[in-house]
């Protein structure tokens, strides 16, 4: 047996493991066959008292682990015993004799022992994947973007906010790289100010996924959104092409956690799903190589949450879950990708889930993935659909509006609607499912939209005709609050975007506002206005149509509409707004829809020019120079150098302040004028003198050329190391450089030698010259007087 950690502290949990040196003849997999039983653990405390734990059953591998928390200082003694056991195998019996382990001592101190194992702190500079598995805690700033709307597969031209709760996100408009993926911007000539087709109406030329530092997006022709060229993969940090899947449309990525007796870790897949929702086919690819692995057929791909097609969700281990509401037969079904795979490829002995081994080229029957398919205990309207699904919260919401029989197929407003809440999980062996609650909503008008998620038990509904919000309890269905009209501008009717994050319902639309409402009482927390633009648009302001991204306490939102004219309006920006206060963090020119955020990087297509812009911190390079010749003590030294951006997008251009970053990037990348008043960054200068003393000698700010200088006078003679440091900013990583000087002691002053008398001839000539000069001066004065 073994105990860890040793030594331990009072109250600290230790792991007590025991292991028999033989295995059962009949043990199969993790749970099959006969396992050894009756293990006892005898514990002697420091005061001599005893306690016994057990009996325990071993795993198939003849060992097990239990936990124990010592309560007093001193030495504990542990000893394991096995009582012996008959194992009845096929055709014979085997007896395993009793045995007792050697005693193991555990020294317990007042405090836990520090074994010196630490993880690096969270990064402040930029970084790239892979992340070392030793860097515990980095999950707090790192995340992937597996679906087009983070954890929603579909990102239509509207209804597409997305919330990534873990990843860091850019705090400035600094561009890491840009890359054109299609023609964009003004063509010129006879076409005047007309721009190339943006694809914002339907095609959506850039709906990126991000997996392990790789961007994947589907390429469409500019002529038809249903047609597909293929899926392209690029490096998140450089824009470099990595692979291309010809003719394949990757719908989403998956990271699946496998955890069985022999396999532990994450596996990444790419999914291409096609066919009707009642009988879909998923083709699964390896995410690293893009090679085909296996195919799942006969999938019931539930409809709901997003109009147009089925909407999968992730389960707790990353499995793909698809809920289906069968209104024709009043049934509710859950399909689980992992169940289908486990059932198709069981461990030896027929135990699904004890190994993950889908064979290359295999075809899996998707019907094996039906986790449950149960009747609903009440009649369900045939038109009812699942409108809201939140697996983390454990609820789904079904909705249907009333229709009058005399106008079959049409709804007369105001109308009534029925809502039903169902659980996303039901108990194993359940033979039916009932709604958690059913509510009839009155006074329903056109354009009802739900929040994309549930938070703290609250979901919201938007009545566009009256421009008001309602908040409801998902546990009871009761209305908690409702607002007055949220806008006094008629364009507020066209509001599509609703997402709950950080305790607020966030919404944006055509009235030019991004607003936040407290989900506990519906009060307005803050609002952000995009500004007046007069006749530049038909709205007097800049609308939002396509939604927004939320990450790292910030909201990334752009100005756009469904089908912008070929002569695009001016003034659209990517706005980054503090999600808690509604204050602007930064903004940059561009019509930038449907971006994705991962690991502190934001990538998005700018419809103004057809280029992908990827924002985030980039590397910097600082240099420092000092005189190469010796310096005499008492003389001043000019220290100079430069600080340059090393990002691929603008390699070796000057670093500028965060406050001027947007204008600087617009100048470098968007044909805008140079911001002549832009400021540089602050450089710290330190020295190590001949005595080994380290001290600061001042700071300098770089200019628009990237250069800086500092005048300094050394205090003592000897060798100096000059260190120039840039601590980094929201835009750039830190960097430093060194230079060296030698300061010589000033020479000792000596008395001049006795002067040698000048020859008489020299004195004569000198005197004559002085006399002539005096005459010239006098003549000049006289001439001036005559004037």
Language-model-detected regions and their locations in the chain:
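Structural beta-strand segments of beta-rich domains
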Residues: 12-16, 635-639
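Residue-level recognition of secondary-structure-to-loop junctions
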Residues: 65-72, 76, 702, 706-716, ...
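Blade-level signature of beta-propeller repeat domains, shared across WD40, Kelch, NHL, RCC1
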Residues: 581-632, 638
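Repeat-blade elements of multi-bladed beta-propeller folds
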Residues: 18, 129-132, 136-156, 190-231, ...
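Enriched for extracellular/lumenal, surface-exposed ectodomains of secreted and cell-surface proteins
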Residues: 76-100, 719-734
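Short amphipathic, basic-aromatic surface patches that mediate peripheral association
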Residues: 19-32, 642-676
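Secretory targeting signatures
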Residues: 18, 173, 290, 477, ...
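Sequence/structural signature of beta-propeller modules
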Residues: 106-182, 351, 359, 624-626, ...
């Amino acid at each position: 047996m073994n105990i860890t950690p040793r030594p331990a502290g009072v109250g600290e949990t230790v792991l007590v493991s025991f292991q028999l040196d033989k295995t059962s003849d009949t043990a199969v997999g993790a749970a099959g066959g006969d396992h050894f039983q009756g293990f006892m653990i005898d514990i002697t405390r420091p005061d001599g008292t005893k306690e016994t734990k057990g009996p325990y059953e071993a795993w198939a591998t003849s060992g097990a682990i239990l936990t124990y928390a010592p309560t007093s200082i001193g030495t504990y003694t542990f000893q394991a015993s096995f009582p012996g056991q008959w194992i009845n195998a096929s055709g014979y019996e085997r007896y395993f004799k009793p045995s007792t382990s050697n005693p193991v001592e555990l020294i317990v101190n007042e405090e836990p022992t520090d074994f010196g194992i630490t993880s690096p702190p969270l990064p402040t500079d930029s970084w790239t994947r892979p992340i070392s598995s030793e860097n515990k805690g980095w999950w707090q700033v790192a995340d992937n973007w597996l679906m087009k709307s983070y954890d929603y597969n579909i990102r239509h031209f509207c209804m597409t906010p997305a919330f990534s709760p873990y990843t860091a996100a850019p705090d400035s408009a600094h561009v890491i790289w840009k890359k054109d993926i299609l023609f964009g911007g003004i063509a010129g000539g006879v076409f005047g100010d007309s721009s190339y087709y943006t694809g914002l109406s339907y095609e959506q030329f850039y709906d990126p996924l991000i997996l392990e530092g790789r961007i994947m997006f589907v390429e469409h022709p500019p002529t038809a959104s249903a047609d597909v060229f293929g899926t392209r993969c690029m490096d998140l940090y450089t824009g470099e092409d990595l692979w291309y899947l010809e003719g394949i449309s990757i719908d989403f990525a998956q990271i699946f956690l496998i955890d069985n007796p022999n396999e532990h870790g994450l596996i990444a897949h790419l999914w291409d799903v096609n066919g009707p929702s009642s009988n879909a086919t998923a083709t699964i690819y390896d995410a690293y190589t893009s090679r085909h692995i296996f195919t799942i057929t006969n999938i019931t791909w539930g409809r709901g949450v997003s109009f147009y097609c089925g909407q999968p969700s992730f389960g707790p281990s990353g499995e793909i879950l698809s809920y289906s509401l069968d209104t024709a037969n009043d049934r509710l079904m859950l399909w689980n990708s992992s169940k289908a795979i486990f059932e198709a490829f069981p461990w030896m002995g027929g135990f699904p889930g004890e190994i993950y081994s889908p064979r290359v080229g295999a075809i899996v029957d998707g019907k094996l993935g039906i986790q449950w398919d149960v009747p609903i205990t009440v009649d369900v309207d045939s038109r009812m659909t699942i409108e809201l699904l939140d697996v983390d919260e454990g609820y789904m919401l079904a909705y249907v509006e009333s229709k009058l029989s005399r106008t079959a197929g049409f709804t007369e407003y105001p109308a009534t609607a029925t809502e039903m809440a169902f659980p996303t999980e039901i108990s194993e062996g359940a033979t039916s499912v009932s709604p958690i609650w059913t509510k009839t909503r009155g006074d329903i008008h056109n354009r009802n939209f739900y929040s994309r998620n549930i938070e703290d038990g609250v979901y919201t509904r938007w009545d566009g005709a009256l421009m008001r919000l309602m908040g409801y309890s998902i546990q009871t269905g009761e209305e908690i609050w409702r607002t007055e009209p949220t806008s006094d501008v008629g364009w507020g009717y066209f509001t599509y975007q609703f997402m709950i994050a950080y305790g607020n319902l966030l919404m944006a639309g055509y009235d030019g506002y991004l607003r936040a409402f407290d989900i506990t009482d519906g009060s307005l927390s803050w609002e952000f206005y995009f500004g007046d633009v007069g006749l530049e648009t038909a709205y007097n302001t800049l609308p939002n149509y396509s939604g927004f991204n939320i990450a790292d306490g910030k909201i990334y939102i752009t100005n756009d509409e469904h089908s912008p004219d070929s002569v695009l309006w001016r003034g659209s920006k990517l706005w980054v707004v503090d999600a808690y206060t509604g204050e602007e963090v930064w903004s940059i020119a561009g019509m930038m829809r449907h971006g994705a955020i991962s690991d502190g990087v934001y990538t998005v297509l700018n419809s103004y020019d057809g280029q992908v812009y990827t924002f985030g911190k980039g590397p910097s390079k600082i240099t420092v120079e000092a005189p190469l010749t010796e310096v005499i003590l008492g003389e001043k030294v000019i220290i100079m150098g430069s600080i340059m951006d090393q990002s691929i997008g603008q390699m070796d251009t000057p670093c500028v302040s965060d406050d001027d970053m947007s204008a600087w990037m617009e100048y470098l990348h968007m044909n805008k004028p140079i911001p002549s008043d832009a400021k540089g960054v602050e450089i710290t200068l330190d020295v190590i003198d001949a005595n080994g003393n380290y001290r600061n000698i001042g700071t300098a700010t770089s200019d628009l050329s990237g250069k800086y200088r500092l005048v300094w006078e050394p205090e003592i003679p000897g060798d100096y190391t000059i260190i120039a440091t840039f601590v980094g900013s929201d835009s750039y990583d830190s960097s430093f450089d060194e230079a060296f000087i030698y300061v010589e002691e000033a020479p000792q002053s000596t008395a001049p030698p006795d002067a040698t008398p000048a020859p008489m001839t020299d004195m004569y000539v000198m005197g004559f010259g002085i006399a002539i000069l005096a005459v010239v001066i006098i003549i000049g004065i006289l001439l001036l007087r005559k004037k």
